[in-house]
Amino acid sequence: MREIRFGLYISLALLAIPFHPLHAGAVANPGGALPVVGDAHNKLIPVAVKGYDGEVARVLKFDLEVMGCKIVPEGAAAYLLAGGNRNSVNGILKDAAGNFEFNKRYNGGNLRQQAHALSNDVIKAITGRNGIAQTRILYKMKTGPRAYEVFVSDYDGHRPVALTSDNTLTESPLWAPGNGEVFYTSWMKIGGVENTTVIRHKMKTGKRKVFSRVKGLNTGGAVSP
């Protein structure tokens, strides 16, 4: 079984790479501290969801529950999300009195990404706050006896993409401001010599540069705002 280890930076604050909005007027999560809609001071929001099946139904349920909703039968709901996911995801949100909040259809990306976008729009309509369902997270994963690689994935662990394939120890992956690049510490060999090295890695191109490799310990790369 592969072990996924999330560093402290993920436990306390998620920095986001917003997924590009799938509809006009959408506001992507700008990143920063993880907004917990249903924290200890708030009651869970009763929402009924109908008309969806398969993976889309599971994604909507997961997203909405993570962001502070409770999925309930229609008769007990403060809000009803109704729609479908044949070919693309669509959704109509209305409150218990029948007042419409929105009626949207999503294009672009796959059905899972469209479901995440719909979840965020539901939270935005109900609470006025941006959701986290399109957040991307950065972490390291053990891939061998003495090897950890850096990965990025959706916030729910799906769509993982390996950023490194160095087959060596890797530590402390960290987003740079703006989320266009990341820093991490690698025990890579250069010229046959293994030494801790802070790497600067550009997300768009995959290009990376040695940021710090002085003799001794190089670790914990961070960027000032």
Regions found by a protein language model. Give the residues of each.
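Amphipathic beta-strand/beta-sheet edge segments enriched in Tyr/Trp
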Residues: K61, G75-D121
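Residue position within the beta-strands of beta-propeller blades
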Residues: R136-K142, E181-T185
